[in-house]
């Protein structure tokens, strides 16, 4: 909600969307808070405590992250929107939504527990969703009884990154204690390098964010498109959609379309917000809130997209190239057949679809697909959503990621 207050803003620094991923209870939210505390000590941002990040009553009651939370901070070189993702397997759909908006990720791994199930699945999902750069932060270093474990853990993490297609030999892997760094900054909010080793380790992580994550190439000249991540009701203001602009740019007063689920809706941009600040224009990569004319809870929902008029349509039938993960990759153990109905993840939406026919690139049609196979498939979703050719998606079933695909053709269903 902080993104929806008032202040004129024009960002002059390079903007990146980064986030924390990793297994449940390994310290992602604490690390997010520690980063803001250290940067606040330098004078670049406002500090955020854990309970201000996991801010919903449900999260406070359960003492765990459930939703993706957005935190703003700046370094000397860059402006960041930080997406703190849930690590529990039950909320993997929210994690996918967060990662789909990131330019790079910080993988948090407990030094005590080492890499766990969601550590590996989050690395896999980051790769499938197009993340090319991951930094690793081995947290809870202070809780280790034997410091000689660290070199072995670091080497293990490098091998895991390589297995999933990341440059593990060169990926930065840093160690520290987010909790002790946060406690030190709460006790003395002024940052002084060399005064506290745990604070210095967070400072080093921040430096690596600036140095290691490449500047993203934004699609500024493409038609405007923003997937809706959340819809928030602001009292005396109305419904505000939040999300990250995928491509193009948008100005206050411009006409847009709301596409997905039902008939396309026409609207106009009333207000643009980025965290605490009002924008006149927002561009690709910006993490914003947008207030549109004439919206209600029926025509303005998570999973829809806001787009330049006449540039995207809703579809529920398409042909896709699909790879089904092997068991060793975390995928299925057994084949599936025509009529299989898993969950498909596109941008910010999770939707059930039916796989109606299968065909090998060489070898013709088949009625059964084995783990490890690459096929073409016709898929019908249970309702239409905004789709385009060459869009990537993730397939999940029963709590496991089982495949990845790319849309080849969009199909109109004949009446």
Swiss-Prot record:
GO terms for molecular function: GTP binding; GTPase activity; translation elongation factor activity. GO terms for biological process: mitochondrial translational elongation. Residues 63-67 are annotated as: G2. Mg(2+) binds at residue 29. It catalyses: GTP + H2O = GDP + phosphate + H(+). CDD domains: EF_Tu, EFTU_II, EFTU_III. GO terms for cellular component: chloroplast; mitochondrion. Residues 84-87 are annotated as: G3. Its main location: plastid. Residues 22-29 are annotated as: G1. The keyword Transit peptide does not apply. GTP binds at residues 22-29, 84-88, 139-142. It is found in: Plastid, Chloroplast. Residues 177-179 are annotated as: G5. Residues 13-217 form the tr-type G domain. Pfam families: GTP_EFTU, GTP_EFTU_D2, GTP_EFTU_D3. Keywords: Chloroplast, Elongation factor, GTP-binding, Hydrolase, Magnesium, Metal-binding, Nucleotide-binding, Plastid, Protein biosynthesis. Its EC number is 3.6.5.3. Residues 139-142 are annotated as: G4. This is a very divergent elongation factor, it is probably no longer completely functional. HAMAP family: EF_Tu_B. GTP hydrolase that promotes the GTP-dependent binding of aminoacyl-tRNA to the A-site of ribosomes during protein biosynthesis. Belongs to the TRAFAC class translation factor GTPase superfamily. Classic translation factor GTPase family. EF-Tu/EF-1A subfamily. This is Elongation factor Tu, chloroplastic. It comes from Coleochaete orbicularis (Charophycean green alga). The gene is tufA.
């Amino acid at each position: 909600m902080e993104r929806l207050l008032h202040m004129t803003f024009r960002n002059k620094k390079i903007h990146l969307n980064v986030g924390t991923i990793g297994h449940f209870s390994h310290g992602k939210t604490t690390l997010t808070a520690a980063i803001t505390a250290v940067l606040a000590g330098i004078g670049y941002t406002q500090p955020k405590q854990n309970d201000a990040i996991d801010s919903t009553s449900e999260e406070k009651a359960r003492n765990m992250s459930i939703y993706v939370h957005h935190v703003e901070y700046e370094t000397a070189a860059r402006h960041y929107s930080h997406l703190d993702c849930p690590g529990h397997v039950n909320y993997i759909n929210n994690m996918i939504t967060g990662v789909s908006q990131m330019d790079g990720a910080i993988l948090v791994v407990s030094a005590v527990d080492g890499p766990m199930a969601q550590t590996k699945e989050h690395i896999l999902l980051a790769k499938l969703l197009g993340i090319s750069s991951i930094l690793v932060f081995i947290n809870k270093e202070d809780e280790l009884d034997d410091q000689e474990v660290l070199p072995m853990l670091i080497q293990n993490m490098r091998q895991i990154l390589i297995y999933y297609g990341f440059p593990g030999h060169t990926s930065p892997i840093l160690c520290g204690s987010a909790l002790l760094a946060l406690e030190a900054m709460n006790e003395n909010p002024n940052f002084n390098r060399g005064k506290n080793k745990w604070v210095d380790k967070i400072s080093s992580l921040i430096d690596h964010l600036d140095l290691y994550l490449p500047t993203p190439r934004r699609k500024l000249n493409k038609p405007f498109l923003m997937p809706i991540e959340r819809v928030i009701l602001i009292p005396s203001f109305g419904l505000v959609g939040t999300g990250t602009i995928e491509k193009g740019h948008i100005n206050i007063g411009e006409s847009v379309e709301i596409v997905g689920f039902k008939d396309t809706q026409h609207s106009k941009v009333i207000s643009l917000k980025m965290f605490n600040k009002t924008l006149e224009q927002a561009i690709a990569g910006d993490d914003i809130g947008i207030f549109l004319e004439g919206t209600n809870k029926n025509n303005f929902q998570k999973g829809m997209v806001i787009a330049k008029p006449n540039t995207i349509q809703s579809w529920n039938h398409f042909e896709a190239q699909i790879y089904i993960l092997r068991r060793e990759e975390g995928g299925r153990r057994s084949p599936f057949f025509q009529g299989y109905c898993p969950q498909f993840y596109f941008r910010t939406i999770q939707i059930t679809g039916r796989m109606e026919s299968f065909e090998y690139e060489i070898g013709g049609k088949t009625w059964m697909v084995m783990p490890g196979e690459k096929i073409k498939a016709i898929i019908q979703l249970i309702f239409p959503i905004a789709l385009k050719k060459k869009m990537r998606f993730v397939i999940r079933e029963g709590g496991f990621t089982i495949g990845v695909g790319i849309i080849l053709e969009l199909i109109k269903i004949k009446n």
